[in-house]
Amino acid sequence: MTETPLPGLPSAWLLGSPGRVLRVVLASAAVAPPGTGAAQHRAGRDAVGAALRRAGSPVTSVGRAYSGAPVCPAGFPASVTHSTALAVAAVAPGARGVGVDLEPRCPDLKLHRFLLDERERAELWPRGDPPGLRRLFAAKEAAFKALSDCADAHGGLFWRVRLGLRDGRLWARAGDRYALVGELAAPAFALAVAVTADP
């Protein structure tokens, strides 16, 4: 595996609610040129394996579910995201779910109409700027992955996951389940990590 650190990518992130802080371990891997789908998936598996190792898992090889999500050992939920150049994996030992998303490009601004509801636009995207929408797109996608077992609440559609601020932290909700979202934004990308937690 060729580890390619994303500038500013921490090796671990602490997310959680008071009294229950969860460690999310991150790892990245370069995607072999020319960045085909198969190369992205290989890099993703490599990144998940590295994150599992760092998290203390006795098993570091991963399978792949029909949905494309990594199949990991019990107690070590994982998520992966990739572009044509880089894969990033997150593992959250002991959590119910974890999600990660990397967005190198800003989405079309017209997407805000179905991506965000009126409250989310007012609270989280008041400037209406492209980097802000990219950041929220990544946050919703990461939260959707963390809350993947809430299909009855979000219908399998990531934009139905709702975001909001609580005590200065970004939370996601699908039905009665919550995930805490951490964000890392730079001029060239937005990265979000979400872990299931109780507010």
Residue positions per predicted region:
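Core catalytic alpha/beta fold that binds nucleotide/phospho-ligands
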Residues: 1-199
